């Protein structure tokens, strides 16, 4: 297939807000691929390279001289082959050799193809083909039910591998995917609840009520003497957290996969600010700040996969090997006990509680109602779409944030409000320094950003409004913190915002 056809597909997907049209457009492209083209094309249309990170940034590619070709003639295989060659370059003179390979490729591409390549190589490709949309398209193109495709993706963590299995082996190949110790699975996610009473009413009394910590999500894998630790985005941080590795290596088991949180504590045992915990992920300078693990789930133990087991069984497995490292929680408390546990969590400096169905399996990568988070105030994780230059004491700083919710159908984030409340002097300075790195456009008053940054917003509620495209507006929104552990795909959807409407 010609590379230009993939570029056209990307353009068409990005030009529509309709999930149905996105899926149909992707399905049509996928059905025309040769077997060897499936893996790279699915990766590209998901905004990534099948080779992973290859050490290419804007400095490498932006000034490569090349006159665009008049006719589109480069094939998918040629582009993928060049990227593989670039990825394999190492040693002395590697930068020059990478530029040479890319210059040769760029000289054979049209202007549209080069623009797509530049954005793909530098991680700046955004065409609206989010993972859920691509998963649907793979199922449709392979003429398979969606559930085995979705499950295979959640267990493999990679859409290209899932697509290859779907096209080559159908349902049998997809169901062959299993939890593999050492390979992270996508984490199960929680939905916000209006109140403890609402969560209790929806899930009934057959629940676990646990502290919701103000920490960083971790997934811990142990296979014999080897321990590997991953973030919620599946990035490995094993080398940055030796104290967690040592602790898990001492647990009385031979193989395990735990889900949990980690955080730094003060001398009095209260949680330190979230940013201090995050500073440990890759920061040598923060090694004197010890992290503590708090596990709340066990997905595998000593050769037995537990993903499909009810939460109650998974908690029993966790209790057998790591009772002293479990997040504080109650099993089947009465309503009074649950309320007391909620108050205790707040008094200890934590965010609130999680209410979880004891009968639910671990739905990797899914945000459902089996887990519900309860906080004293409403909070949303939103995408920063832009920022306005301040005035008065904020003159010279990027201040008033434009906030967007995720479109569940894969379109661009939907603006739902603005705020400058809660911004400290340090945050104002950080925004002013950082935002230009994510800039897509600007005018005299505003710098508009690519949807890269996620910020946690506290708000009093939501109201109907015609001021913003989503038909909603945030009430008394204020910035709590930025979430470097989350991507735009982790932001709350417009449906989550709408669920906070009164009545």
UniProtKB/Swiss-Prot annotation:
Chemical reaction(s) catalysed: ATP + (deoxyribonucleotide)n-3'-hydroxyl + 5'-phospho-(deoxyribonucleotide)m = (deoxyribonucleotide)n+m + AMP + diphosphate
EC number(s) per entry: 6.5.1.1
Gene3D superfamilies (UniProt xref): DNA ligase, ATP-dependent, N-terminal domain, DNA ligase/mRNA capping enzyme, Nucleic acid-binding proteins
Pfam families, A to Z: DNA_ligase_A_C, DNA_ligase_A_M, DNA_ligase_A_N
Active site: 212 (n6-amp-lysine intermediate)
GO molecular function terms noted in the UniProt entry: ATP binding; DNA binding; DNA ligase (ATP) activity; metal ion binding
Cofactor dependence: Mg(2+)
Enzyme class: ligase
Matches recorded under SUPFAM superfamilies: ATP-dependent DNA ligase DNA-binding domain, DNA ligase/mRNA capping enzyme, catalytic domain, Nucleic acid-binding proteins
Record-level GO BP terms: cell division; DNA biosynthetic process; DNA recombination; DNA repair; DNA replication
Keywords: ATP-binding, Cell cycle, Cell division, DNA damage, DNA recombination, DNA repair, DNA replication, Ligase, Magnesium, Metal-binding, Nucleotide-binding
Record InterPro entries: ATP-dep_DNA_ligase (IPR050191), DNA_ligae_ATP-dep_bac/arc (IPR022865), DNA_ligase_ATP-dep (IPR000977), DNA_ligase_ATP-dep_C (IPR012309), DNA_ligase_ATP-dep_cent (IPR012310), DNA_ligase_ATP-dep_CS (IPR016059), DNA_ligase_ATP-dep_N (IPR012308), DNA_ligase_N_sf (IPR036599)
Residues the record lists as binding ATP: 210, 217, 232, 261, 296, 367, 373
Signal peptide location: none
Function: DNA ligase that seals nicks in double-stranded DNA during DNA replication, DNA recombination and DNA repair.
Family in the record: Belongs to the ATP-dependent DNA ligase family.
Protein name: Probable DNA ligase
Originating organism: Rhodococcus opacus (strain B4)
Lineage: Bacteria, Bacillati, Actinomycetota, Actinomycetes, Mycobacteriales
Gene transcribed to yield this protein: lig
């Amino acid at each position: 297939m010609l590379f230009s056809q993939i570029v056209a597909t990307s353009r068409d997907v990005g030009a529509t807000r309709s999930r149905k049209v996105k899926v149909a457009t992707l399905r049509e492209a996928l059905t025309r691929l040769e077997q060897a083209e499936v893996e790279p094309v699915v990766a590209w249309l998901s905004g990534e390279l099948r080779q992973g990170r290859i050490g290419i940034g804007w400095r490498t590619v932006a000034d490569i001289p090349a006159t665009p070709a008049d006719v589109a003639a480069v094939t998918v295989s040629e582009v993928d082959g060049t990227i593989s060659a670039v990825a394999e370059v190492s040693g002395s003179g590697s930068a020059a050799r990478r530029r040479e390979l890319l210059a040769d490729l760029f000289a054979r591409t049209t202007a549209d193809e080069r623009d797509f390549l530049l954005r793909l190589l530098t991680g700046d490709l955004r065409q609206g083909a989010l993972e859920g949309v691509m998963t649907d398209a793979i199922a449709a193109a392979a003429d398979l039910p969606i559930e085995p495709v979705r499950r295979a993706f959640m267990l493999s963590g990679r859409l290209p591998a899932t697509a290859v299995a779907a096209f080559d082996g159908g349902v049998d190949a997809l169901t062959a995917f299993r939890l593999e110790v050492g390979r992270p699975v996508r984490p199960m996610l929680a939905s916000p609840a209006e109140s403890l009473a609402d969560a209790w009413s929806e899930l009934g009394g057959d629940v676990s009520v646990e502290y919701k910590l103000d920490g960083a999500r971790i997934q811990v894998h142990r296979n014999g003497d080897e321990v590997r630790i991953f973030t919620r985005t599946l990035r490995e941080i094993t080398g940055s957290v030796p104290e967690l590795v040592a602790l898990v290596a001492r647990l009385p088991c031979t193989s395990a996969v735990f889900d949990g949180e980690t955080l730094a504590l003060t001398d009095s045992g209260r949680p330190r600010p979230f940013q201090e915990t995050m500073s440990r992920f890759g920061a040598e300078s923060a090694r004197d700040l010890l992290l503590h693990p708090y596990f709340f789930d066990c997905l595998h133990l000593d050769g037995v996969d537990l993903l499909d087991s009810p939460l109650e069984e998974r908690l029993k497995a966790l209790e057998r090997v790591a009772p002293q490292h479990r997040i504080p929680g109650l099993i089947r408390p009465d309503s009074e006990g649950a309320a007391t546990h909620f108050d205790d969590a707040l008094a200890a400096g934590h965010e609130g509680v999680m209410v979880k169905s004891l009968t639910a399996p671990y739905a990797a990568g899914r945000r459902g109602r089996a887990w519900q988070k309860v906080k004293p105030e409403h909070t949303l994780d939103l995408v920063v779409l832009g920022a306005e230059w301040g005035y008065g004491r904020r003159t010279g700083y990027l201040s008033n944030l434009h906030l967007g919710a995720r479109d569940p159908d894969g379109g661009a984030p939907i603006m739902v409000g603005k705020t400058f409340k809660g911004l400290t002097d340090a945050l104002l300075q950080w925004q002013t320094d950082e935002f230009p790195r994510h800039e897509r456009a600007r005018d005299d008053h505003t710098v508009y950003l690519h949807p890269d940054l996620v910020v946690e917003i506290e708000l009093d509620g939501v109201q109907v409004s015609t001021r913003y495209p989503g038909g909603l507006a945030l009430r008394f929104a204020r910035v709590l913190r930025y979430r470097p552990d989350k991507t735009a795909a982790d932001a709350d959807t417009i449906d989550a915002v709408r669920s906070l409407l009164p009545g």
